[in-house]
Amino acid sequence: MAKILVLYYSSWGHMEAMAMAAARGAGEAGANVTIKRVPELVPEEVARKAHYKLEQEAQIATPLELADYDGFIFGVSTRYGMMSSQLKNFLDQTGPLWAAGKLVNKPATVMVSTATQHGGAEIALASTQLALQHHGMIIVPLSYAYQGQSGNDTVRGGAPYGMTTTSDTDGSRMPSAQELEGARFQGKRLAEITAKLVR
């Protein structure tokens, strides 16, 4: 049974919801799924004033534990079109894993949350994937196999590179049913591909 880590950062709960949906999908594919988050870097007083969701069910991950998993689903909140500093800081601490080749040939997929439709989702997906490629990880995209991303009748997350969601600048828009379904689809796809590689 493939061991999948869903690792995310979420300020207001949007990516937390996407991570839970992706975990459900991975579980449907028969994977042993663990959901964890990266540590918050914003001082607590500042985070509380900004109404961050500081109490989240997922435990805090440590960088070196990534070696224990077969595949990964990364949930990324963006800042100015890039991955958040919280996830970047976490990945910057994985140097020992890189030096030992511990993540080589392990599948990974990425989802992104932005405040606006044009807030850099595709750039954040690509730049996060670049960091994972330095580890030799195998990138598993959402792809157009998930047809729910097509159409322009409403605000609709998704890109061939990974699932996306838009929160609005005040955080008032939570992931839609279509976006949560896309996250579930992406999680299941990652788990199915991982299972084929760990046989």
Curated annotation (Swiss-Prot):
InterPro entries, per the entry: Flavodoxin/NO_synth, Flavoprotein-like_sf, Flavoprotein_WrbA-like, FMN_Rdtase-like_dom, NQO
Limits of the Flavodoxin-like domain: 4-190
Obligatory cofactor(s): FMN
Protein name as catalogued: NAD(P)H dehydrogenase (quinone)
Annotated signal peptide: none
Family: Belongs to the WrbA family.
Keywords, comma-separated and alphabetical: Flavoprotein, FMN, NAD, NADP, Nucleotide-binding, Oxidoreductase
Record GO terms (molecular function): flavin adenine dinucleotide binding; FMN binding; NAD binding; NADH:ubiquinone reductase (non-electrogenic) activity; NADP binding; NADPH dehydrogenase (quinone) activity
Residues where FMN binds: 10-15, 78-80, 113-119, 134
Region described as Disordered: spans on this chain: 155-175
EC numbers on record: 1.6.5.2
Binding site for substrate: 98
This protein's record includes keyword Metal-binding: no
Enzyme class: oxidoreductase
Pfam families: FMN_red
Catalytic activity: a quinone + NADH + H(+) = a quinol + NAD(+); a quinone + NADPH + H(+) = a quinol + NADP(+)
Cofactor binding note of this UniProt entry: Binds 1 FMN per monomer.
Residues at which NAD(+) binds: 12
Domain of life: Bacteria
GO CC aspect terms: membrane
